[in-house]
Amino acid sequence: MPQPPIAPLVPPAHVVDLMTVAGSAVFGARWKAKEAKLVECPALSDSMPEFKTTYDIDPHAELLGFDDSAWPEVAATELGAKRGGGMVSFFWFRSALTIPANAAGFATAGAKTVLTVNVDDYAEVWVNGEMPRAAGRPSPATIQGFNMPNRLVLRDTVTPGEKFEVAVFAINGPISAAPANFLWFREAKIEFYR
């Protein structure tokens, strides 16, 4: 599997904060959220004989076109609110983003476009049903570290009108040292580079 693109380390030409009403409106973003649960399921068929069960998450909201219409809507300004029951907990956040020709004063055509999210404590980020990753290589969509941002290149040269379906799987952790706190977004933004 090829190395996923890495976001630039230089300052962006323009940033839009998705945690504001105005910022989310630029992309037509409506955030939905739902708690995810660990559920017991049968072990894989080639597991060692002593393993009869294992665990999966429910729902699998990373799928492109996943129906989140019954999920509660979360105002952009409420993305930073504490969610989950604390300890080991999981939450899905979903939104569709449409790239405008003009993003709050910035002409977007041809710009490198990066989605940055920072979830307390960890996140996995799916875009259009894919989580770009490669074993043994930096993979910005996967867990980056304790309270570290995920910075995914959405497109090297974006075209106005392009749509991105984003699903963020938020994880409260460390899992083996269950914290007495909750999960929330520290930041969510779109960065443009020239």
Regions found by a protein language model. Give the residues of each.
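Aromatic-lined ligand-binding clefts that engage carbohydrates, nucleic acids, or primary amines
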Residues: 62, 71, 89, 97, ...
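Residues that flank catalytic or metal-binding motifs in active/ligand-binding sites
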Residues: 67, 91-93, 121, 148
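Beta-strand-rich interaction surfaces with strong enrichment in secreted/lumenal proteins
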Residues: 80-87, 94-96, 104, 140-141, ...
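Flexible loop/turn segments at secondary-structure boundaries
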Residues: 122-124, 133, 173-176
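Solvent-exposed beta-strand/loop surfaces of large extracellular or lumenal domains
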Residues: 126-151
